[in-house]
Regions:
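PLP-dependent enzyme catalytic core of the Aspartate aminotransferase-like
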Residues: 1-3, 14, 85, 126-127, ...
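N-terminal "arm"/small-domain region of PLP-dependent enzymes with the aminotransferase-like
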Residues: 2-68, 76-77
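Conserved PLP-enzyme active-site core in the AAT-like
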Residues: 2-9, 17, 21-25, 87-317
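Short, acidic Gly/Pro/Ser/Thr-rich loop/turn segments
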Residues: 25, 43-47, 235-236, 297, ...
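Conserved N-terminal alpha-helix of the aminotransferase class I/II PLP-enzyme fold
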Residues: 46-95, 120-128
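Short, glycine/acidic-enriched capping/hinge loops at junctions between secondary-structure elements
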Residues: 47-52, 100, 425-426
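Short amphipathic alpha-helical segments
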Residues: 59, 85, 286, 290, ...
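Conserved C-terminal alpha-helix-loop-beta "cap" of PLP-dependent enzymes
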Residues: 301, 309, 313-316, 320-411, ...
C-alpha cells in the first residue's frame, strides 16, 4: 500500500468511512488495520519538547486522558464524514452533550432546546444543569416565533436533534440555524439518529454536531462512547458572547483559543479544559470498535432504512395500531416537506407507534416479541423495542411525556438488519397474541 496523496475532499462517503485518518499503513508495524494503542502516557524527547506539547505550540500526544493515536483516527474520520474541521471522542453520548453545553454556557446562562429530545438529554437540561446555574427553555421548534421569543441576552445556544427521540420528527435545520446566527449564537445538533450518511447538519448551517457513538456509529451494541464535531464556521470573536473561547484563559497559560486554534477553537477547548479537568475519556479499545463500525456505516444504514420503511408501511395499515409516528407517513404537510428535503434517501429506523389499548396492552405486546430485544439501546444491527413512558422517559411528568408525543400505549421500535420478512412475522405474532 502506498500513501494516499490525493485530496480526500473529493472522495465519496463510502471511501471516507474506510480511509480517513489512516492514509498509509501503520508506520511502525505496517499493520493495515488501525492499531489499538493501549497506553496511558507518551515519552517526550526532552524537557523543551514536553513544554511545547503542554503549551499547545507542538501538536501531539500529552497524556491518555487527552489524546490517543487510535482515538485520533476515529476523530479525524467522523469529522470528515460530518464535514467538520475537528472532532473529539468522549466516554459517552451524554458526555458529548454535557461538555458541549458546559463549553458554551456558565452560571447564569441558558440554552433553548427542542422539546422532543432523548430522555437523558431532557433530564440533563431540566434537572442537572440548573444545579450549576444553567437553565434550559424547551420550545416547539416548528414554531419559529416561539423559538425567537425564548432567546434572550443570556442564551448561549439552540439545541435540536435531526430526528427527534423517540418519534423521528424532523426539524428544519436550515431555518433554525438562521435564527441562531441572527442572535449570534451557535446551533448544536444531535445527529445520532440520522448519521452523516443520511444528513450532514453542518451543510445546513449547524455549528456543532454531537453523537452517541454507541448507536449507529458503533452499530453492534458493544461499546459506549460519544463524539463532538466542530463545524469550524462559527465566528466566536464576532459574536462577543463567548469570552472563555476568545479571551485569555487563566487555566491554560492565558491563551485565547480562537487565536491559537483558529476554526477548531471550540473542540480544542473542550479537550484542553473540560476533558482535562473532568476526564470523560473514551477508551482506545472502544475507539477501535467505533472505527470498525464506521467502515460499514453506509451499508448498515441502507438496510436499517429499507427495513424501517417496510415496517412503517405494515404498522400504518394494521387494525390494532392507533397511529405511527414516522415522518414518511405524517399527516402534517410540513413534516412531509422537511422529510423530503433532509432525507431524500429515506431515514428514521427508530420511531414509535401507539397500539390500540392501554399501557398494559403495550407491555403485553412487547413481552410477546421474540426477535426484538427489550433493552434501552437503539440503532443496533438487531431489532430492539422498549416502552418509553416507563423506561427512557420515565423521569418525565405526564405533561412532559405528552409534550414529547409519548403516551401510555406508545411503543418505540429500533429496526435492525434482519430479513424484513422475519421482522414483520415477529410483529405479526405479537399482535395475534394480544388480539
Amino acid at each position: 500500500m502506498t500513501k494516499i496523496t490525493r485530496d480526500q475532499r473529493n472522495f465519496k462517503f463510502e471511501t471516507l468511512q474506510l480511509h480517513v485518518g489512516q492514509e498509509q499503513a501503520d508506520p511502525t508495524t505496517d499493520a493495515r488495520a488501525v492499531p489499538i494503542y493501549q497506553t496511558s502516557s507518551y515519552v517526550f524527547r526532552n524537557c523543551d519538547h514536553a513544554a511545547a506539547r503542554f503549551g499547545l505550540s507542538d501538536a501531539g500526544n500529552i497524556y491518555g486522558r487527552l489524546t490517543n493515536p487510535t482515538e485520533d483516527v476515529f476523530e479525524k474520520r467522523i469529522a470528515a464524514l460530518e464535514g467538520g474541521v475537528a472532532a473529539l471522542a468522549v466516554a459517552s453520548g451524554a458526555a458529548a452533550v454535557t461538555y458541549t453545553v458546559l463549553n458554551l454556557a456558565q452560571n447564569g446562562d441558558n440554552i433553548v432546546s427542542a422539546k422532543n429530545i432523548y430522555g437523558g438529554s431532557f433530564n440533563l437540561f431540566e434537572h442537572t444543569l440548573p444545579q450549576y446555574g444553567i437553565q434550559t427553555t424547551f420550545v416547539d421548534f416548528f414554531n419559529e416565533k416561539e423559538v425567537e421569543n425564548a432567546i434572550n441576552e443570556k442564551t448561549k445556544a439552540l439545541y435540536i436533534e435531526t430526528l427527534g427521540n423517540p418519534n423521528s420528527d424532523v426539524v428544519d435545520i436550515e431555518s433554525v440555524a438562521r435564527i441562531a446566527h441572527r442572535h449570534k449564537i451557535p446551533l448544536v445538533v444531535d445527529n445520532t439518529f440520522a448519521t452523516p450518511y443520511l444528513v450532514r447538519p453542518i451543510e445546513y448551517g449547524a455549528d456543532i454536531v454531537v453523537h452517541s457513538a454507541t448507536k449507529f456509529i458503533g452499530g453492534h451494541g458493544t461499546s459506549i462512547g460519544g463524539v463532538i464535531v466542530d463545524g469550524g464556521k462559527f465566528d466566536w470573536e464576532a459574536s462577543g458572547k463567548f469570552d472563555s473561547l476568545t479571551k485569555p484563559n487563566p487555566s491554560y497559560h492565558g491563551i485565547s483559543f480562537t487565536k491559537v486554534c483558529g476554526p477548531a477553537a471550540f473542540v480544542t477547548k473542550v479537550r484542553a479544559i473540560l476533558l482535562r479537568d473532568t476526564g470523560a475519556t473514551v477508551s482506545p479499545f472502544n475507539a477501535f470498535l467505533f472505527l470498525q463500525g464506521l467502515e460499514t456505516l453506509s451499508l448498515r444504514v441502507e438496510r436499517h432504512t429499507y427495513n424501517a420503511l417496510k415496517v412503517v408501511e405494515y404498522l400504518n395499515n394494521h387494525t390494532q395500531v392507533e397511529s405511527v409516528s414516522h415522518p414518511s407517513v405524517s399527516t402534517d404537510p410540513k413534516q412531509q416537506e422537511l422529510y423530503k428535503k433532509y432525507f431524500p434517501n429515506g431515514g428514521g429506523s427508530i420511531f414509535t407507534f401507539d397500539i390500540k389499548g392501554d399501557a398494559q396492552k403495550a407491555k403485553d405486546f412487547i413481552d410477546n416479541l421474540e426477535l426484538f430485544s427489550l433493552l434501552a439501546n437503539v440503532a443496533d444491527v438487531k431489532s430492539l423495542v422498549i416502552h418509553p413512558a416507563t423506561t427512557t422517559h420515565s423521569q418525565c411528568t405526564e405533561d412532559e411525556l405528552l409534550d414529547q408525543g409519548i403516551r401510555p400505549n406508545t411503543i418505540r421500535l429500533s429496526i435492525g438488519c434482519e430479513n424484513i420478512d422475519d421482522i414483520i412475522q415477529d410483529l405479526d405474532e405479537a399482535f395475534k397474541a394480544v388480539a
